[in-house]
Amino acid sequence: DRDGQIAASGEVANGVLDQLLDSPYFDTAPPKSLDRNQFDVSLVQSLSMEDGAATLTAFTSVSITRALPHFPEKPLRWLVTGGGRHNKFLMANLSRELGVDVEPVEAVGWNGDALEAQAFAYLAVQSRKGLPLTYPGTTGAKGPTTGGVYFSSS
């Protein structure tokens, strides 16, 4: 959805949005983690493409906003990485919902297209060295935990 044009032309299906947001995940304090399969996106399949995109965009921005009570203090600025940072409609929704500036990470000189790859490279090095990838304070794991499997192409 280039620049969020499709979502911007749709209407949020509030009933569907409420169903998506009706998850104990949002009321659970960190540490916690989430799987992409946790939500039933089939709820939007009966919607038009425009309304489905608008509803999922609203879900994204509202779900991020619902995390705010779990922060020690409200951020004064949000930096966004990943493909969503190119979606003007999503970025505007986030700014409206959060009530502060929401900018792509390029605003501070970071490469938003490389950041995820850099993070995975860091995790790969941690894994190869047998160092922790997760800690109790970040995901609720019982202790610092490494992970991953190394496969050689030779």
Regions found by a protein language model. Name each.
Residues 1-75, 88-99:
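A contiguous, well-structured pocket-lining segment that forms one wall/lid of small-molecule binding clefts
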Residues 4, 10, 82-84, 130, ...:
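Glycine-centered flexibility sites
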Residues 11-18, 86-88, 139-154:
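Short, mixed-charge aromatic SLiMs
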Residues 50, 78, 108-111:
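Membrane-interface transmembrane-helix boundary segments in multi-pass integral membrane proteins
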Residues 52, 64-71, 94, 104, ...:
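Non-transmembrane, aqueous-exposed alpha-helical and coiled segments at domain scale
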Residues 58, 106-153:
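Glycine-rich phosphate-binding/hydrolytic loop that grips phosphoryl groups
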Residues 76-86, 117:
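Glycine-rich beta-strand-to-loop/alpha-helix junction loops that act as flexible
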Residues 87-90, 111-113:
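Short active-site-adjacent structural elements
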